[in-house]
Regions:
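An N-terminally biased module of ancient metal coordination in phosphate/nucleic-acid-related enzymes
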Residues: 1-86, 106, 296
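Ligand-binding grooves and catalytic loops that recognize ribose/phosphate and carbohydrate rings
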Residues: 6-8, 76-133, 248-267, 272-275, ...
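Acidic (Asp/Glu)-rich catalytic clusters
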Residues: 31-33, 56-61, 75-88, 110-120, ...
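Hydrophobic faces of well-ordered beta-strands that scaffold small-molecule active sites
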Residues: 39-44, 66-69, 87-92, 123-125, ...
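Acidic-and-aromatic substrate-binding clefts and catalytic sites of carbohydrate-active enzymes
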Residues: 45-52, 67-76, 96-107, 145, ...
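Distinct, well-ordered alpha-helical segments
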Residues: 52-54, 80, 101-102, 177-200, ...
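Active-site gating/metal-coordination segments in enzymes
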Residues: 73-189, 233, 238-240
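H/E-rich (His + Asp/Glu) clusters that bind or coordinate divalent metals
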Residues: 206-208, 212-380
């Protein structure tokens, strides 16, 4: 029995999918060694002013000095009031609108320009396999392809504004074994990368491919992708996915990969906040139902930072405190909704940790921010 299982006997009232062992994540933060640099989280979704303040506490406890967030355009100013200069923004479409064709097309271009006017210098192009479902509902199955004409129009606008790109390509191998088993609809996993490679060649500014480029299960593939495209960077966001798959990578092979591409691998969490996390879970959408009060919301946010820091900087070896439903999805006869994989820490050398947590993002993105600030000064 590990120390978390023992802790579960002390406070079972705290047990939830983000806290399988009922631990105090605020107290746990003090057990980490202080870092000589602030962590830069390049991938989050911070919305909701009340939830944002709970996230702010978790971020401060776990050493996050700067957060890049896919905040909805209408909430950018509210988030600035909470975080000041410790948050920067990534342009995204309006996902909640009723006119998807407009929101993914001309409406997205309008929002890119709106974000840019507020100092944002990164645009996110989401192209997960399930985006085909949105495209079909609009009436054009190809609309959400990364290289569709509509997407390229938006990319050209962002490019002309001097913005960098972020993208979501593919999804976990577990999803291709289950949700995406019908390749005639979703394509194979390798199929997802053909549009990306074409766009990397056309738009040569830096790209950040989220979630270890969508294939943390296959470092060999990522080696080739990064070699072919020097403008490509990866972030390490999506805690459950990274815990499950990075834990399985042999430490030496992972270190060799991170060493070879030092400066091109950026830390991210993919934490999602919303004020719905503070209300009882009745008739909520999946993302909103992940928490139903302030304590659960804090656990939801802090657990990701706890787990990711353990993964990268420690020799932790034990079950993850975060439930991973993918286990049950793949093997329902062997797993429950509350089961979790082993978290096997990789104890990265300090130079690689510094690059991952801070230096890579600072070197890549700080010049963009400086340009934004200079432009704002000139307009005054």
């Amino acid at each position: 029995m590990n120390r978390f299982a023992q802790a579960a006997t002390q406070d079972t009232s705290r047990i939830n999918p983000s806290n399988r062992f009922g631990v105090d994540y605020a107290a746990e933060a003090a057990t980490f060694s202080p870092l000589p640099f602030p962590i830069i989280d390049v991938h989050s979704h911070i919305n909701g002013p009340k939830a944002a303040r709970i996230y702010q506490k978790a971020a401060e406890l776990y050493g996050i000095g700067l957060t890049y967030s896919m905040t909805q355009l209408e909430e950018v100013q509210a988030m600035r009031e909470v975080f000041g200069d410790r948050i920067r923004f990534i342009a995204v479409p309006r996902w909640s609108g009723q006119d998807k064709k407009h929101d993914m097309g001309a409406g997205f271009i309008e929002r890119i320009e709106g974000y840019h006017a507020l100092g944002c210098r990164i645009t996110k192009f989401w192209a997960a396999p399930r985006s085909v479902e949105i495209a079909k509902s609009i009436g054009d199955p190809t609309l959400m392809r990364l290289d569709s004409p509509v997407r390229q129009q938006a990319m050209q606008v962002a490019h002309d504004l001097g913005m960098y790109f972020m993208t979501h390509i593919a999804d976990p191998d577990t999803w291709f074994a289950t949700k995406y088993a019908d390749a005639s609809i979703y394509g194979s996993k390798s199929d997802q990368y053909l549009p990306l490679e074409r766009m990397l060649d056309r738009f040569t500014q830096p790209w950040i491919a989220a979630h270890m480029g969508g294939w943390p299960e296959n470092l060999g593939f990522l080696n080739g992708l990064l070699d072919r495209h020097p403008n490509l960077y990866l972030d390490t966001s999506a805690a459950k996915w990274m815990i499950r798959e990075i834990s399985q990578q042999p430490r030496q092979q992972l270190i060799e990969f991170l060493t070879r591409f030092k400066g091109r691998i950026l830390y991210g969490s993919d934490i999602v906040t919303m004020d719905e996390h503070l209300a009882p879970a009745e008739n909520k959408m999946e993302m909103a139902a992940k928490a139903s009060d302030r304590e659960q919301a804090f656990d939801l946010y802090a657990s990701r930072y706890w787990a990711l820091r353990k993964l990268w900087e420690s020799d932790e070896r034990g079950e993850s405190p975060i439930a991973d439903p993918d286990l049950k999805m793949v093997a329902p006869d062997r797993h429950s909704d509350m089961d979790a994989p082993m978290l096997i820490g990789k104890s990265l050398p300090r130079d690689l940790l510094g690059s991952l947590y801070h230096d890579a993002a600072h070197t890549l993105l700080e010049p963009l921010h400086a340009q934004s600030q200079a432009g704002a000064t000139q307009r005054m």
